[in-house]
From Swiss-Prot:
Its EC number is 6.1.1.5. It catalyses: tRNA(Ile) + L-isoleucine + ATP = L-isoleucyl-tRNA(Ile) + AMP + diphosphate. This is Isoleucine--tRNA ligase. It holds the Pfam family zf-FPG_IleRS. ATP binds at K596. One of its GO terms (molecular function) is tRNA binding. Binds 1 zinc ion per subunit. One of its GO terms (cellular component) is cytosol. A motif ('HIGH' region) lies at residues 57-67.
């Protein structure tokens, strides 16, 4: 027998190296085969429901780091809630309609106009489903648990039917209307866009000042006076029918050479500098209200432009007189309608000037800027041309600029129930709190929602037209269409004639001959996803409406959060969510947006292959995702190191509780040593803190609290101290079993606490814990206990940890001075102040063991510390090399080695342990 055979060295098959890239897939396969998600749902039947509703990602392409951040965050919450007393089903979803899929098919050579609409839409459906399969694999590879076999998909028949019913509920209340209004128009995709489909990029635009000659100055201005406007869209000058001024502002007529001009008084100096007027002389000052209904000559066409009053005119830029084209601007439209101006669009669907822009027909609008500017110059109306770069709206899919263009569209009136939506926002809890203001302001300031789209791949608007062109939006017809969609899918709209889509025997006074046509436009995709609260939450029996939480990127304040709120309040009167948690974007290590063109993209698959999905999950738990998050390979390397520390500490506890049977070896709390009870109290604190942080969705605090406890409390202190007991004492020694009791309790609690973040690692530890549940994911979160001596222990041991820290400094200095090597070579004498002396009396533990030294003594109170002592605020410390020899079993420096003649190699403590437990060693001696 060798000396090491008498030690209780921890042994385990739990590997030091995680092998995450390989082993995670094995665990994920087991979860699927054993239906762990379904088992968890069954366990939670009858418990209160927590409903996190998944915002559907678009089914196009593999997932990126933003997807990973979002889906893992959701998974952490759902796993935690499921383990903490809630029934928390998670149904993933996908958004499948819209332009990107049409674009992908075009790239593959599919020609939409060379096939039937139903054949084309079938290709779109097939592409979407193939992308869903790809993304489902990606999400599951991240360890995300959910009902992956029964996701919700916006192209599902029942989903489309529910969406039609949401539309019907809005129509019934009078919120849907048909109108000619300027809307965001994407010439690159030939369709209207919602505000949520707009993104801003810098663009270079012309900046022109144009003079309109007064025709009727209402007795205030002569006809030799010019009204000066400023615009950055020369192509809209042919659509000009008016000039708008603010009734409250002061305006001036100024003489410049032999010309007279009118600008806002406050902007005169700036305009004069821009145009190059020298010494403009003010002739008159008057209010904007005095100019109301004056007229001026259009600089290009034989018609007049009307001067109008409106409050939207500001002094931020320009001249204080606003070029007004009712067909190409929202404010222009509002004031134009008020004054009875025509609403004319001078651009067609593809962005080319049309017949309403004589002289420029067939010219692309951006090219027309140059031609129109030249025409203005030729007429003597151009006062200044310049160029500047500014933030300009672009199509979020094609990345091309968009324009405002008046078209006849279907709208949802926000004004009709705006106050109701704003009141609903007050019922929602927002994290971060600024989200409430952001969403409130967006709803308060937004215009009506244009819900029609001129595309092929989407849910048709369930609207019919009578013989006289009257739209038919009736409860009976809408419900019938919803039933048809539920049975056959929305393709039925394109497969059948209008009469075959109407209820049998349907008649309408506007169609005396029984002839009907159907709407060709489809729904805005935001109406698709925005109807999920009814199509999914209210429709599926295992789910519930409203949701407890919507968790998405901060761009969804103008997207899914927004559209869902509008449709939900319209259809049901309440918000679809009780809480919103928003996240920032994932950027590269330099804070730049990730893009293929910059070559700075990092995809989850790459990180999974190098580090494992567990490292991505741990990274998600360490970042503050309420704002933008930087991502680099270095981040994951650092996270991998943090993971290694967590794993190694847990592995140590697994190894050193291998011979511990919790059923028979557990030591009651009251019988534990002081340091053991202190660690139980600390564990209790950790359980409370971690669960509080989970409840607040504060993953960073969860991770920091767990890691700090593992690394600082356990690895750097308790487990280090425990080695002298767990390794050295007899297997069933009460002190050893006491420390194993603490280790096992910590390991069990921490494994449960890390399961939502590190599920693969938790499952790897779980079999060693001998628990009744087959998987950690099926266990419940640990409950904090109540210990009567908690505050007393925390007070005592807080003082001891300060004391220990100072002794460690003294040991480090002794090591630097070559007095000792390891701390076990040290003999420590302390000269404490009275409070420290009292604390050491209260600790009630072997201080030498706690300091991991071979000798420790407290000098008598009357003894003066020697000059060579290390001085601290409340004590002095002397460190010497301990007298004696190193015991080969406990590694302490002892003066009593050989005192037992039967075991002359050992110190008296080790000899007594070996003699009592290993008689062969006494009889035969140790092998060399």
């Amino acid at each position: 027998m060798k000396i090491k055979d008498t030690l209780n060295m921890g042994k385990t098959s739990f590997p030091m190296r995680a092998g995450l890239p390989k082993n995670e897939s094995i665990w994920q396969k087991k979860w699927d085969e054993d239906h762990v998600y379904e088992q968890r749902q069954k366990l939670n039947e009858g418990k209160p429901t927590f409903m996190l509703h998944d915002g559907p990602p678009f089914a196009n392409g593999n997932i990126h780091m933003g997807h990973a951040l979002n889906k893992i965050s959701k998974d952490i919450i759902v796993r935690y809630k499921s383990m903490n007393g809630f029934r928390a089903p998670y149904v993933p979803g996908w958004d499948t309609h819209g332009l990107p899929i049409e674009q992908q098919l075009a790239k593959q050579g599919v020609k939409r106009k060379e096939m039937s609409m139903t054949d084309y839409r079938e290709l779109c459906r097939q592409f979407a489903m193939q992308e869903i399969d790809k993304q489902r694999t990606d999400f599951k590879r991240l360890g995300v648990m959910g009902d992956w076999e029964h996701p919700y998909i916006t192209l599902q028949h029942h989903y489309e039917a529910s969406e039609i019913r949401v539309f019907g509920a809005m129509a019934k209340k009078g919120y849907i209307y048909h109108g000619l209004k300027p809307v965001y128009w994407s010439w690159s995709s030939e369709s209207t866009l919602a505000e949520a489909e707009i993104e801003y990029h810098d663009d270079k635009s012309p900046s022109i000042y144009v003079a309109f000659k007064v025709v009727d100055g209402k007795g205030l201005l002569d006809t030799d006076t010019y009204l000066v406007i400023w615009t950055t869209t020369p192509w809209t000058i042919p659509a000009n029918y008016g000039i708008t001024v603010n009734p409250r502002f002061d305006y001036v007529q100024v003489q410049v050479g032999d010309k007279k001009y009118v600008v806002a008084a406050e902007l005169l100096d700036r305009v004069a500098e821009e145009i190059g007027w020298e010494n403009p002389k003010i002739l008159k000052t008057f209010k904007g209200t005095d100019m109301d209904k004056m007229t001026a000559q259009h600089p290009l066409y034989d018609r007049t432009s009307l001067v109008m009053n409106a409050d939207h005119v500001t002094l931020d830029a320009g001249t204080g007189l606003v070029h007004t084209a009712p067909g190409h601007g929202e404010d222009d439209y509002k004031v134009g309608v008020k004054y009875g101006l025509p609403v004319v669009s001078v651009v067609d669907a593809k962005g080319y000037m049309n017949e309403y822009a004589p002289g420029f027909e067939g010219v692309f609008y951006d090219d027309a800027n140059k031609q129109i500017t030249q025409a203005l110059a030729d007429k003597g109306a151009l006062l200044k041309l310049d160029f500047f770069t500014h933030s300009y709206p672009h199509d979020w899919r094609t990345k091309k600029p968009v324009i405002f263009r008046a078209t006849t569209q279907w709208f949802a009136s926000i004004d009709a129930f705006r106050d109701q939506i704003l009141k609903a926002i007050d019922t929602v809890d927002f994290k971060p709190s600024w989200g409430k203001t952001r969403l409130y302001n967006m709803i308060r300031d937004r215009g009506d929602w244009v819900i029609s789209r001129q595309r092929a791949w989407g849910v048709p608007l369930p609207i019919f037209y009578a013989e006289d062109g009257e739209p038919i939006i009736e409860e009976e017809t809408i419900n019938h269409v919803a039933d048809l969609f539920g049975k056959y899918g929305s393709n039925v709209w394109f497969e059948r004639e209008a009469k075959d889509l109407l209820p049998e025997g349907y008649t309408n006074p506007h169609s005396p001959n029984g002839q009907f046509t159907k709407e060709k436009d489809i729904m805005d995709v935001w109406f698709d996803s925005g109807s999920s609260h009814q199509a999914v939450l209210a429709a599926r029996p295992e789910l519930s409406f409203p949701a407890d939480l919507y968790l998405e990127g901060s761009d969804q304040y103008r997207g899914w959060f927004n559209s869902s709120l509008i449709t939900s309040v319209a259809a049901t009167g309440v918000a679809p969510y009780r809480g919103i948690l928003s996240q920032g974007f994932t950027l590269d290590g330099k804070g730049r947006k990730m893009s293929k063109s910059l070559g700075n993209t990092i995809v989850p698959a790459t990180i999974e292959k190098q580090f494992g999905a567990e490292i991505i999950r741990l990274w998600v738990a360490t970042v503050d995702s309420s704002s933008d998050v930087r991502v680099s390979v270095d981040n994951f390397a650092q996270t991998s190191e943090a993971y290694r520390k967590i794993r190694n500490t847990m592995r140590f506890m697994v190894a050193n509780t291998g011979d511990f049977d919790p059923e028979k070896d557990t030591v009651a709390y009251d019988e534990l040593g002081s340091v053991d009870r202190y660690m139980m109290v600390r564990l209790n604190q950790i359980i409370k803190q971690v669960k509080t942080a989970y409840d607040a969705y504060d993953f960073a605090t969860v991770e920091k609290t767990i890691s700090s406890f593992l690394v600082n409390d356990l690895s750097a202190f308790y487990l280090d101290v425990a080695k002298d007991v767990v390794y050295i004492e007899a297997k069933d020694d009460p002190k050893r079993r006491g420390m194993q009791t603490v280790m096992f309790a910590a390991l069990l609690a921490l494994t449960k606490l890390i399961t939502p973040i590190l599920p693969h690692t938790a499952e790897e530890v779980w079999p060693y814990l001998k628990q009744p549940e087959a998987y950690a994911a099926l266990a419940d979160m640990p409950e904090a206990e109540q210990f009567d001596d908690e505050s007393q222990l925390l007070d005592i041991w807080s003082g001891f940890m300060d004391f220990r820290s100072e002794v460690q400094k003294a040991l480090e200095l002794a090591r630097d001075n070559k007095v000792i090597g390891k701390s076990l070579e040290a003999a420590v004498t302390v000269y404490p102040s009275e409070p420290v002396r009292d604390m050491l009396d209260d600790v009630d533990a072997n201080v030498m063991q706690l300091l991991i030294t071979s000798h420790f003594e407290i000098a008598p109170a009357t003894t003066q510390a020697p000059a060579n002592a290390e001085q601290f605020d409340d004590m002095a410390v002397v460190v010497k090399h301990a007298d004696g020899e190193v015991c080969p079993r406990c590694r302490m420096v002892r003066t009593d080695i050989g005192t037992d003649p039967k075991l002359p190699q050992l110190c008296s403590r080790c000899a007594a342990i070996v003699e009592a437990n290993f008689p062969d060693a006494v009889t035969n001696g140790f092998d060399k």
